[in-house]
């Protein structure tokens, strides 16, 4: 009764008003699974291909009708009749049907939409929530959120090069408390920005985008906002950065417009170390350019015992590239973005590889999101203990947080919130 009888995709819009792919998978039992695919702004060179139409007469060339057609024709023909519980087999069929390393024929937005919709349909058919279907029985951790409260880089029109300044409520006793902590700091930050004459418009991920003079000024604002909300930075909340360094790495140097300076990789590692010494920063994502392996090695040697160093553009959720990074001893955590690799099975393989090598995993959204909340279930199913899904505004971000609230409620005593234990790889 769990055989696939129909697969249908459509073009919908994401949180930036750009087209993306949504897919429905119908099973013989009458159950349907639906999933929608996110899209990134700052993307890694080795990410799986997001197939766009290129027709400038529609959505400035960003339409996804080709990807939709691939789902409704080649993929549907290959998968109809197969048991939806055979997730790995289904994903492998799509990988072979595409025939490229980067999903360049079918498009990762086509394969991922189907992969996630199949999992949702199979979970529904089994009478299980998605996190239980994928994660099995037993206790599960709710993730510590990385809440993006100040935006820079490609996510905002300001002078800050570092793309995301985030708070992590590690002192909370539950996810519900952590969410309240983040929301209260977010609103305190808004009042603080107002009082200083900064605009309170928000960036793609819901954080504020004030035109500050330096990265230190952004971090100091976060300290003040935490205190104004009744929390202590360094105890109740820790900070996290997403440098997205590939966006300002040119000609072998890191160019910081906000600072008016350029740095070699060794100098930029020292710059980041200076921020860590001055502020309670526990996590730095993409602290070096994705191709600057020497810089990553320097940064890992300098900070890898006390700070989580997350590879996003560096690893692009690709098990092969992650394995290379593990072998070279760079970074100590993996950012997990399902659309970087294009299937659920490959995503889970990357998370498993990270765990086996004591690399932490951070489940992540993209800057272009939808109301789809699959990553919330994935964060719990994989027990990855961290999630990055934006600020405390915009319903596309809140959809994930609200789903985590529901999951915590459903799990009750079987749920736990790890707090600082989420950074288990540090000090190893």
UniProtKB/Swiss-Prot annotation:
Chief subcellular site?
Answer: cytoplasm
Q: In which pathway does it act?
A: Carbohydrate degradation; glycolysis; pyruvate from D-glyceraldehyde 3-phosphate: step 4/5
Which cofactors are required for activity? Answer: Mg(2+)
Active-site residues per Swiss-Prot or TrEMBL entry: 205 (proton donor), 337 (proton acceptor)
Q: Which PROSITE patterns match?
A: ENOLASE
Q: Where does Mg(2+) bind?
A: 242, 285, 312
Query: For (2R)-2-phosphoglycerate, which residues are the binding ones?
Result: 163, 337, 366-367, 388
One Gene Ontology term of the biological-process aspect is: glycolytic process
Record keywords, A-Z: Cytoplasm, Glycolysis, Lyase, Magnesium, Metal-binding, Secreted
Q: Which reaction does it catalyse?
A: (2R)-2-phosphoglycerate = phosphoenolpyruvate + H2O
Which Enzyme Commission number(s) are on file for it? 4.2.1.11
Record family assignment:
Belongs to the enolase family.
List the protein's name: Enolase
Supply the source organism for this entry.
Answer: Neisseria gonorrhoeae (strain ATCC 700825 / FA 1090)
What gene does the UniProt entry assign to this protein?
eno
């Amino acid at each position: 009764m769990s055989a696939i009888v129909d697969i249908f995709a459509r073009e919908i819009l994401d949180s930036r008003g750009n087209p993306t792919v949504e897919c429905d998978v119908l099973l013989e039992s009458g159950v349907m699974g639906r999933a929608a695919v996110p899209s990134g702004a700052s993307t890694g060179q080795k990410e799986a291909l997001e197939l766009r139409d290129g027709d400038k007469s529609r959505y400035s060339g960003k339409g996804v009708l080709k990807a939709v057609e691939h789902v409704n024709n080649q993929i549907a023909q290959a998968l109809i009749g197969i048991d939806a519980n055979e997730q790995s087999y289904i994903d492998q069929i799509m990988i072979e049907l595409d025939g490229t390393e980067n999903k360049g024929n079918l498009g990762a937005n086509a394969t991922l939409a189907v992969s996630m919709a199949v999992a949702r349909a199979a979970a529904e058919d089994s009478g299980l929530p998605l996190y239980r279907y994928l994660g099995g029985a037993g206790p599960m951790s709710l993730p510590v959120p990385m809440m993006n409260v100040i935006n820079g880089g490609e996510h905002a029109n300001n002078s800050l090069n570092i793309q995301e300044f985030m708070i992590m409520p590690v002192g909370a006793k539950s996810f519900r408390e952590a969410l309240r902590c983040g929301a209260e700091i977010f609103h305190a930050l808004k009042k603080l920005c107002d009082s200083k004459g900064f605009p309170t418009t928000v960036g793609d991920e819901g954080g504020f985008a004030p035109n500050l003079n330096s990265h230190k000024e952004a971090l100091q604002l976060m300290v003040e906002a935490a205190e104004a909300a009744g929390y202590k930075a360094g105890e109740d909340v820790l900070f996290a950065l997403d440098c997205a360094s590939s966006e300002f790495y040119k000609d072998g140097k890191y160019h910081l417009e906000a600072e008016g300076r350029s740095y070699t990789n060794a100098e930029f590692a020292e710059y980041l170390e200076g921020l860590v010494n001055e502020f309670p920063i526990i996590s730095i994502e993409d602290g070096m350019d994705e191709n600057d392996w020497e810089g990553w090695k320097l940064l890992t040697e300098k900070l890898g015992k006390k700070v989580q160093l997350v590879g996003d553009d560096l690893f692009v959720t690709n098990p092969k590239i992650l394995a290379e990074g593990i072998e070279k001893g760079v970074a100590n955590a993996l950012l997990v973005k399902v659309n970087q690799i294009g299937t659920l099975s490959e995503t889970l393989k990357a998370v498993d590889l990270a765990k086996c090598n004591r690399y932490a995993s951070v489940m992540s959204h993209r800057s272009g999101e939808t109301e789809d909340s699959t990553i919330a279930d994935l964060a719990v199913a994989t027990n990855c203990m961290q999630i990055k899904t934006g600020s405390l505004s915009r319903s596309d971000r809140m959809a994930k947080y609200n789903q985590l609230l529901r999951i915590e409620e459903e799990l009750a005593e079987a749920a736990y919130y790890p707090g600082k234990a989420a950074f288990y790889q540090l000090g190893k």
